[in-house]
Amino acid sequence: MGSKGAYRYHWQSHNVKHSGVDDMVLLSKITESSIVENLKKRYMDDYIFTYIGSVLISVNPFKQMPYFGEKEIEMYQGAAQYENPPHIYALADSMYRNMIIDRENQCVIISGESGAGKTVAAKYIMSYVSRVSGGGPKVQHVKDIILQSNPLLEAFGNAKTVRNNNSSRFGKYFEIQFSPGGEPDGGKISNFLLEKSRVVMRNPGERSFHIFYQLIEGASPEQKQSLGITSMDYYYYLSLSGSYKVDDIDDKRDFQETLHAMNVIGIFSEEQTLVLQIVAGILHLGNINFKEVGNYAAVESEEFLAFPAYLLGINQDRLKEKLTSRQMDSKWGGKSESIHVTLNVEQACYTRDALAKALHARVFDFLVDSINKAMEKDHEEYNIGVLDIYGFEIFQKNGFEQFCINFVNEKLQQIFIELTLKAEQEEYVQEGIRWTPIEYFNNKIVCDLIESKVNPPGIMSILDDVCATMHAVGEGADQTLLQKLQMQIGSHEHFNSWNQGFIIHHYAGKVSYDMDGFCERNRDVLFMDLIELMQSSELPFIKSLFPENLQADKKGRPTTAGSKIKKQANDLVSTLMKCTPHYIRCIKPNETKKPKDWEESRVKHQVEYLGLKENIRVRRAGYAYRRVFQKFLQRYAILTKATWPVWRGDEKQGVLHLLQSVNMDSDQFQLGRSKVFIKAPESLFLLEEMRERKYDGYARVIQKTWRKFVARKKYVQMREDASDLLLNKKERRRNSINRNFIGDYIGMEEHPELQQFVGKREKIDFADIVTKYDRRFKGVKRDLLLTPKCLYLIGREKVKQGPDKGLVKEVLKRKIEVERILSVSLSTMQDDIFILHEQEYDSLLESVFKTEFLSLLTKRYEEKTQKQLPLKFSNTLELKLKKENWGPWSAGGSRQVQFYQGFGDLAILKPSNKVLQVSIGPGLPKNARPTRRNTVSSRGYSGGTNNNYPMRAAPAPPGCHRNGLTRNQFVHPPRASGNQRSNQKSLYTSMARPPLPRQQSTGSDRLSQTPESLDFLKVPDQGAAGVRRQTTSRPPPAGGRPKPQPKPKPQVPQCKALYAYDAQDTDELSFNANDVIDIIKEDPSGWWTGRLRGKQGLFPNNYVTKI
């Protein structure tokens, strides 16, 4: 639940270097140029995240950034957005907390062009949610699957393109499902449009899917032998584009990650081997080449048939037959007839490629199903959805795949517009909120151009119609499609045609699509002959990948790839609309993929088409937060007695009551017909802080009661265990032998300045103010803290130079790891003195709670070392001193402490040169034990007060200074990864391994080496969408919500600040000299209650004078 009472000890943005503005709503000038300049300034200083209200802008740094470790996870967990610099962890934490508190599904839509960093952003969100959510072994298993699904799906679904070295060639919507307690206990992946054509063809300079290169680089010698793995240029499919290696990708290491991921997900070793067999089989399939014999295709070299047949478990002759011929069914009248058709070379190559594409797609679907089955749960409760989908892209030659990819991105842009620009403004009108509309470009016109069914029909409808009417025709279908497009939508302002294709004016710019293969790829039909061939495999696993029932009659029009992606896109939109959305807008700063390289025109183009300027204007003029009355009352009911546990009256009046209870200014909110609208994020933060403080207070009451109950039960046993350490060895004090053990005698909850020295999640076992004696036996007070890991001695010093000169600050004097303590020495008398012995030097300390301290220290020492801590008892103790830096003659030396029988219960100390003499009267016998009777509470921190005022007196005007802030530097060690399962060495096939034939030519030999133009990498022409953006009417300078009426003069008493005061707790006011403060309540304690700049809190009355 956040940082509770120690907000000022969080690492806050004002403690680090500022670069531009964190939230672009605060920009003084709202233009594309000022947005680009702010992003550039931050990017060059390695700040890749920036806010627009709650929207996160992320610029791809093209390098590993240092702020994604355990320290940052701790920093952002439970913290409000304004407390820390912009970060993807803040957005992830907001999603997770809102899901738990509001009981609503959340989703994050990550958008941006190819190479902008969407996939990496999705990984960070999933890893953060996995890290901060709790759970036992079963939950941990689900977390492991969530995290390991990434490398597995990337291996089979990602590839290097000219724009991105790790480009997602499929779309993915990952739902992490949670129990009501916020533990991830299930998940589900929906995948969209795998670009399977990449297996058999791609642009120059690109690669196929990573798994092919991983297998060749990472397979063991035994695997290479059995799978026929050799050099990359041996395989036609890989040599097509002439690109094998990628600078920042280690295929050998990634192959081991892929195998480990399959193990974690629960894919059996036999299935893993079969998956790799199919991957190798695809590569060998590509090496089958054809020649023309009498106008028909024949296999050029039949020895290349043997290895793919062997790996896929099929007959070599059947493979040859199905690649060069096909059974076609024809109907004449009422009769059906099957005709055997021999294929030409082009058709045979197409058939071979169709089989290779189908094999890869079916394996990919198998992996997705395996992941889903491993995370399956019988019912859904709450979930967080992460949308990681291929980015908008433009290549030298753009085909059907790019058309589908850019259509999905067009739909995502529409969602953003609908929810952040259009719906927000319409909501103000519906709710009766005063508002001046802000114009923007709505890309719905482009979506309709692509997906509309009628009046006029969209491109996809026309494409499906052509495919249906020309289903038996291979040639000429693409030109027919182009002609129909020109006839039906040729006049559309966002559409143009050219001799080989058409142009769409997308929101992100003009894209030229080549018609070649459009209809064939849209049909996406796998011939029955190939399904029969794979069903004839001797391997049940491969058979299971092709479950089609070939005997069933095919009725109706077959589903096309275009209609499938359109349905998937619309289903995705429906799913996202049911969730509370969050947005990450990814920006690609350059095409070189190098850090610190900034292309101004490219970034400006993205800023324009992403609509960031309009987003800032709507956010700035509008309301940061809106909620239906009932939900608002439910969330903040705990703030007042009248609303808790339920408000009995009119919901609108209940909301107004809550807002007035926190003294929110009336110009900071409006009440609509069914919702409350809050303007400034700071006002919302005030509500959240008050709510958190209430829950924190009640939680402390419950904790205190429970701890008291547990303590009463255990303290007798604890005292007895502690006394056993000293039994028959040391005399005991009469007043302390039966006392309770408190542990915290300082009140650490009220002293965050001491907590800064301890790890944030480190438990404090013992805290007390002790006396520490130096080499001259001069006593000085120290705070002694004991945790399971370390012992701390903290002192105070006055700062001698710098901006904090004159301030007294806490200083860590000594930190000893528990296992480094050698022994502890004590006398046999009833005194409170003990010596901690350590390798370097000893510490002479005095504490009235030594018995309790020693019992806890011995327990922690045993946990760390599995040994008993040596305790030495003698009336002459040796003390080893610290070496002083006084040159070559420096020496630590030693001192002696001698104990004598004296009078009274207070020890009398007499230092004499190098000896300290301690005399004290006799105590209880050494064999004394605590009794089991009830005892009165010993001195210690009570843990609370009976009023809301600070326990300290009101501070004197300037002269007393509060302690400074120190940033917490504790970092958890990284978790070691487990051992990975060894590679599989044997194949699952009964066939004998055939010899590997020599490849006669590579794919690059078969392709014409024409030089490729790189013009497509330039910033695209903005087209009609850009023109529409430029011509949208601008609102008047004071557009948006009308200026509120001036507030009436206050009728409450006021005072003027004589001096500046910095709040030292969350319920206090900070103010500057000459500030005017409204006085709410005067109190004799010296702490008055007042209100300044919309915040109510306590302040010292001797810093002000009444007006």
Curated annotation (Swiss-Prot):
Where along the chain is composition biased (Polar residues)?
933-949, 977-989, 998-1012
Q: In which tissues is it expressed?
A: Detected in brain stem, brain cortex, cerebellum, stomach, colon, heart, lung, liver, spleen and kidney. Detected in utricle, cochlea, outer hair cell bundle cuticular plate and vestibular epithelia (at protein level). Detected in cochlea and vestibular tissues. Detected in kidney, lung, spleen and intestine.
Check the record and name the InterPro entries matching this protein: Ie/If_SH3, Kinesin_motor_dom_sf, Myosin_head_motor_dom-like, Myosin_TH1, MYSc_Myo1, P-loop_NTPase, SH3-like_dom_sf, SH3_domain
Start-end of Pro residues biased regions: 1034-1051
Cellular component GO terms held in the UniProt record: actin cytoskeleton; adherens junction; brush border; clathrin-coated endocytic vesicle; cuticular plate; cytoplasm; cytoskeleton; microvillus
Residues spanning the signal sequence: none
Chain ranges of the Myosin motor domain: 19-692
| Location of the SH3 domain | 1050-1107
Domain IQ: residue ranges:
695-724
- Domain (TH1) spans 730-922
Task: Kindly list the positions annotated as binding ATP.
Answer: 112-119
Q: Which residues carry this modification: Phosphoserine?
A: 1001
Coarse class of the primary localization is cytoplasm
One example GO MF annotation: phosphatidylinositol binding
Region (Actin-binding) spans which residues? 581-591
| Cellular localisation | Cytoplasm; Cytoplasm, Cytoskeleton; Cytoplasmic vesicle; Cytoplasmic vesicle, Clathrin-coated vesicle
Q: Where is region (Disordered) located? A: 920-1052
* Keyword terms: Actin-binding, ATP-binding, Calmodulin-binding, Cell junction, Cytoplasm, Cytoplasmic vesicle, Cytoskeleton, Lipid-binding, Motor protein, Myosin, Nucleotide-binding, Phosphoprotein, SH3 domain
What function does this protein fulfil?
A: Myosins are actin-based motor molecules with ATPase activity. Unconventional myosins serve in intracellular movements. Their highly divergent tails bind to membranous compartments, which are then moved relative to actin filaments. Binds to membranes containing anionic phospholipids via its tail domain. Involved in clathrin-mediated endocytosis and intracellular movement of clathrin-coated vesicles. Required for normal morphology of the glomerular basement membrane, normal development of foot processes by kidney podocytes and normal kidney function.
The similarity annotation says: Belongs to the TRAFAC class myosin-kinesin ATPase superfamily. Myosin family.
Name of the protein: Unconventional myosin-Ie
